[in-house]
Amino acid sequence: MHLLPEIIESAPEIQDIRRNIHAHPELRFEENRTADLVAEALSSWGITVFRGMGKTGVVGRLDGELGPGKMIGLRADMDALPLQEHNNFAHASRNPGKMHACGHDGHTAMLLGAAQYLSNHRDFKGSVIFIFQPAEEGGAGAREMIKDGLFEQFPCDAVFGLHNWPGLAEGDFGVTAGPMMASSNTFEITVTGKGGHAALPH
């Protein structure tokens, strides 16, 4: 896979951001430090920042210099999991019982990398909306952002997200139209009948 020299050049900075987020994981709707980091980075690149959607969500808007056009959303999640990290590298979690075990630190850093690149290359029509979602892990953060008017304020023509996938070879991308990954849901059933032994159900 061919990477632009500018992307390679910015990789250490984006890696530092990822490690910073990894070392300070925050659970759903508690992503205040992460949201501050995201907002500060976007602002420093001249991207307009909107806070408060979905409680701790952050949205950045970048308008192209070639006039009106499509509005494209790029989305990443920011929350960590309630797990104890047992790694011993320098950027291991400093928050007991919290860990970025699903790669949202990477997702957030990658989207910031895309934002940084596009902020330096505004020769496009339309707008890019950078959506940093809280509470993906069982907190319905996307629903909360939508309830707070995300797509009324930013009527995107399309929204793209990604998830890291260690099973794919480095440099490969898996793409599909529509939903791709299953969600975990709970439900209850009631069975009416007589009790008995499993070996003698009759």
PLM regions: where:
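Histidine/acidic-residue-rich, glycine-tolerant segments that coordinate divalent metal ions
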Residues: L81-L83, N87-M99, G106, F124-H202
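Acidic/His- and Gly-rich active-site-bordering loop/insert found
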Residues: M1-H100, A109-L112, Q116-F124
